[in-house]
């Protein structure tokens, strides 16, 4: 019942379905049962949750035995992460599957929405469920893979915006999965799709697994290419934003924007899940490496312009991985802070969504706008940073706008660079 699972449960309950959510965190469950949003930033969640909790249409528990037996459908939205060697770590997902399977009763549909390497639903989880439950897939229960395709902060809108992909282990199981999602979801009309928006059967779990990995890996590869263009543009004194704008003026070019980091639970992780099945995919691995190096590159640009960062006061603006979302998963802040520490800078971090104590929990000193600083590096595109001026950062000698969110007109007379801006001001 996290940032994806809770909105999903709320959406189902708002559609008239009886929903029980399971999570290992009792504090989160207590908040949900009390109608209190456990985490900020999800549009409409604070509005939708209270009446559902008070009516009992949605309730939360830490006990699988209180939720799984007799369920028509079980939707798994448990995190799958990568370890220090960038290999999929199935520990949490395996444990959740075992706990669920121990209470599974005949007739239930099990849908995995967590992004998985190709072949995992059929090769790992269907056999595991059979082993623990003693039931037989395709006879006593059905398993499908149906990837979540939503973005935190706008889950309710995204559920209606994008087709729901469903892949089963057999034809009848897939049909059942399609019927389930047609019953719990509704869709926006879109004339830009090759077929009507709605639930799209994929002909197998593997196709659905690959579709999710392919769409997210494409984004990482595209951003990696944009970042490569940006680094060359910096070296050549070219504004890459104008180049990309020109390229994208014809229909065959869709170059993404370069930036200081690619963060979040999805885009930095899912290429690794793809590579788990296709380790020879050199384009994918090269793009992932290029994107992972961008925080250090941004710091190196500052060091090159100033001669050295040794002893300088540097404020990193933005702990979150993206603007407006209180989440640090794979945020570029970690790479930026690490590179600054290696350069000998005095580092502090600012984020409008985090308190001083929350920043301190990461081991960072908090920076407050208005305090003296030598260098500022924008890492997250928070809306409040768009209006930043040198007056907000007294003494600033250089702004590295890693997200290109500030207005150049507000920085006239103070050195400001962007990723791929091709600018080399005198500091």
Predicted feature locations:
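Structural/interface elements that position substrates and couple domains in central-metabolism enzymes
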Residues: 1-427
């Amino acid at each position: 019942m996290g940032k994806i699972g809770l909105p999903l449960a709320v959406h189902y309950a708002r559609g008239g379905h009886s929903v029980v959510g399971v999570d290992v965190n009792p504090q989160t469950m207590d908040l949900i049962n009390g109608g209190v949003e456990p985490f900020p930033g999800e549009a409409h969640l604070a509005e939708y949750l209270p009446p559902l909790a008070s009516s009992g249409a949605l309730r939360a528990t830490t006990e699988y035995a209180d939720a799984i037996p007799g369920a028509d459908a079980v939707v798994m939205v448990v995190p799958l992460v990568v370890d220090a060697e960038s290999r999929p770590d199935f520990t949490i997902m395996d444990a959740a599957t075992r706990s669920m399977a121990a209470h599974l009763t005949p007739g239930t549909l099990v849908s995995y929405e967590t992004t998985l390497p190709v072949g995992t639903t059929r090769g790992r989880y269907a056999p595991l469920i059979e082993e623990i439950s003693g039931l037989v897939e395709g006879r006593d229960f059905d398993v499908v893979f149906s990837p979540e395709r939503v973005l935190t902060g706008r889950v309710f809108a995204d559920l209606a915006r994008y087709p729901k992909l469903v892949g089963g282990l057999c034809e009848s199981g897939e049909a059942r999965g399609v019927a389930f999602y047609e019953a719990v979801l509704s869709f926006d009309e879109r004339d830009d799709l090759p077929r009507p928006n709605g639930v799209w059967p994929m002909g197998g779990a593997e196709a659905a697994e690959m579709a999710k990995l392919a769409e997210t890996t494409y984004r990482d590869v595209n951003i990696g290419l944009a970042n490569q263009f940006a680094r060359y543009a910096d070296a050549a004194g070219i504004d890459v934003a104008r180049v990309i704008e020109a390229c994208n003026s014809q229909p065959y070019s869709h170059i993404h924007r370069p930036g200081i980091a690619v963060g979040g639970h999805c885009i930095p992780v899912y290429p690794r899940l793809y590579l788990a099945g296709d380790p020879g995919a050199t384009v994918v691995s090269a793009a992932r490496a290029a994107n992972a190096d961008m925080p250090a590159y941004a710091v190196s640009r500052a060091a090159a312009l100033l001669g050295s960062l040794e002893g300088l006061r540097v404020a990193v603006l933005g702990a979150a991985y993206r603007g407006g979302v209180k989440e640090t998963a794979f945020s570029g802040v970690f790479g930026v802070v690490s590179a600054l520490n290696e350069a000998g800078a005095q580092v502090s971090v600012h984020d409008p969504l985090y308190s001083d104590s929350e920043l301190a929990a990461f081991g960072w000193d908090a920076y407050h706008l208005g305090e003296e600083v030598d260098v500022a590096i924008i890492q997250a595109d928070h809306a409040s940073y768009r209006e930043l001026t040198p007056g907000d950062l007294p003494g600033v000698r250089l702004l590295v706008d890693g997200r290109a969110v500030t207005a150049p007109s507000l920085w006239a007379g103070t050195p400001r660079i962007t990723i791929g801006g091709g600018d080399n001001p005198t500091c």
